[in-house]
Curated annotation (Swiss-Prot):
PROSITE patterns named among the record's database cross-references: RCK_C
Assigned protein family: Belongs to the AAE transporter (TC 2.A.81) family.
Pfam family, one: TrkA_C
Protein keywords: Cell membrane, Membrane, Repeat, Transmembrane, Transmembrane helix, Transport
First-listed, main subcellular location of the protein, grouped into a coarse class: membrane
Protein name: Uncharacterized transporter DIP0830
Single GO biological process annotation from the record: potassium ion transport
Membrane spanning stretches: 4-23, 30-47, 57-79, 91-113, 156-178, 362-384, 389-411, 424-446, 456-478, 516-538
Domain of life where this protein originates: Bacteria
GO CC field: plasma membrane
Topological type in the membrane: Multi-pass membrane protein
Location of this chain's protein in the cell: Cell membrane
Domain RCK C-terminal intervals: 187-271, 273-354
Amino acid sequence: MDIFVANPLLALFVIMAVGLAIGQVKIRGFSLGVAAVLFAGVGFAAVEPDIHIPHLVYILGLSIFVYSIGLESGHAFFALFKSQGVKQNALAITALALITGISIALFSLIHLNGVTAAGLFTGAVTNTPAMAAVVDSLPSIFGDANKVHEVESLPLVAYSLAYPIGVLGVIAAIGLCAKWFRIDHVQEAHDAGVAVEDLFTRQIKVNHVVTGSDLVIDIHHTLGLEIIVSRIERDGQQTLPTASSRIHMGDVLSVVGTAEELDKAAHVLGDLLPGDPFHGHDLDYRRIFVSNQDLVGIPLAKLRPRLSGILITRVRRGDHDHVATPETVLQLGDRVRVVAAHDRMKSVTALFGDSYRRLSDFNLFPLVAGLALGLLVGMIEVPLPGGAALSLGSAGGPLVVALVLGAVGRSGRFVWQVPYGANLALRQLGITLFLAAIGTTAGASFRASLSDPASLTIIAVGAIITLTLAIFVLVVGYKVMKIPYGQTAGMLAGIQTHPAVLSYVSAMTKNDLPALGYTSVYPLAMIAKIIAAQVVLFALT
């Protein structure tokens, strides 16, 4: 182990590699995933306590991790507030406030010191940024550097002991409650309109008078369906719909949507026609990769003048296709299905970019500038009685700034978003760096705790906190607030801010309801837990 003591950088990457390898091991369908890196770091440092990874590494990793999450979630987070977001976040904040109060009462009952209690709390709610905020707050409480060094391993040890039950307990609660409530995930997704279905293009002949707006671009609002008209055939000539195009009797519309939505549209408009919508016509379609920064971060409705003679019908982001609407905002790395004349396809392709190489050369300035701004926001302190100070820290600051910038999308020439693939890579790298570095600070103390009977008390109290939070959210969300169970379970995963729980729920439901719930509460839950952990620390220290 001497080689790792003398070479911290080597130790860092070996810990990361070992942890990621262990994280891929599945036992009955469950794996620790990237969280295994934390335990790898603890294990290495338990064997050789002199292994030290520089403090800056975990700060850097944590900041990158939360910033990339905020950028990806920002637009959806603020959009959801216009519909269900307020109700869902009210449940999340109520649950976290309740569990914070219960935790403080439990910790006081067993006479647990504030530093260990705060670490236990962050492990029970599985939030590493909150644990980092606790460590960051220690100097404002103890002042003396030697005292800080003496106690800084305590929250990490308590976190490590409570963390496994924090994950497994929530997963068990979700699975058991699903059986208890007899949830039909297929029917639930269908009722909520989020069943994962393929998109098709079909021809519909207009034989009925359209009630409401007869503008083609308004058809999804007029009919209340997630569809888009990609072409209009009139008197044997096919054209692309424009902002002023209207639906006439006898028109043949090429419509994109799910099979069910297309059947509903045909019932209202007229008759569904057989055949290939593209056969024998001058219009063509193609999937094109978005790498032109000038087109991202702007709703399609505002891009329409630049897209004259072009129609975007579908947007594929990650592994899912979405019907393009006027409100859709493109991101770098999206794959769009466009319809245009044959002879324009070359220029259309050039307009969108269609270049993986160009995408890899994205401007780093907005990324580092946003991170710098986030760290500055995280440094803002709110004084508390007794001389302590509350702050968002290196996790909360970047997250708040990223949420705002992710919702804004772009400022003039600067595109705040990063390509989807790059975002996922940054997120994975950031959390891996953080967990590897933070794990090594607790090794010696963790080894000693394994032979300490008090560790069982920490694990038991952590389990009580985890299960109380899980059952409260599932019962109140599903039974009282009538939120679909899959979405409620996704909200619980978001409140726990743990991707492993989301993966489990998504695999169980096989639809997008968990992702909707997760995205709606994750950012606010992250910030709330960063603050709650410090409240526990200050209340009991």
